[in-house]
Amino acid sequence: MKKILLCLIGIFIFTGAFSQDSLTSHYWTDGTAFNIPKHRWELGLFTASRYGIGKNLELSAHPLMFFLMPQVKIKVGWGEFSGFRLATEHGIFYPTQFMRLVATKGTGGLISPEFTIPQMFAISNRFLASYKPFKKAVLTAHAGITFAVKFGPLDKRTTIDLPVIYPRLAVFYNEPEFDAGVDFRGQFFPRFGWLFNVENFIICGTRNNYFLENKGVLAYTSKKETLRIEAGYKLCFGKYPAGPQWHLLPVIDLIFGIGR
């Protein structure tokens, strides 16, 4: 039971479901080239929490998992050009502590304890371009690259072959990883929003080199933009070591907004 719970928590944390309907105020804008307002907090239950450092600068991290599996990102807005909003996102991810925790026998074990997990981290860089095809909708395209730094060998038998988690850890076993995708979100009724996106991962140096994730979300936002409830699905396809697999996962989250 603990193993199943640990897997679900990990998948929810990696999944990150967002939607947006407050387009003019730039709330709930993770996954787009827009930054949240200065001094505003958005605290997610399963997703990364975000803070607006300045007009064109925001910081995101997972507070509940920070000491177990830290992942910190900074998004920099570069302004608007010919109707397109441009931004770059830069992050660092440290999975060593988490992988060592699950390297155990019995309940909660995802990796055999016979293997040594070295100190390692990954650095990611992503370019985002957003465009508003309609007044209450945003279309975003993004592309990025992630590469890993390891301070020792990592046995390929230590992979965690689970959807969402595997493609994000694959960079530690192979060459750099490229990602590209599109994100389409907006508002169809006051307080109700939607999101639909597709993300592709291409991993160099291995035959298990392609993963696809498609997410669809409906969301309700409170009148004062202090609470957002999201629910939907995530469809995953990947070329795992055991062969191609499909997975359909639920997506749920509560996000609390503080400040304007």
Where are each of the predicted segments found?
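Transmembrane beta-strand segments that form the barrel wall of outer-membrane beta-barrel proteins
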Residues: 31, 35-67, 72-74, 78, ...
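Short hydrophobic/aromatic-rich motifs at helix boundaries and adjacent loops
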Residues: 20-21, 42-48, 185-188
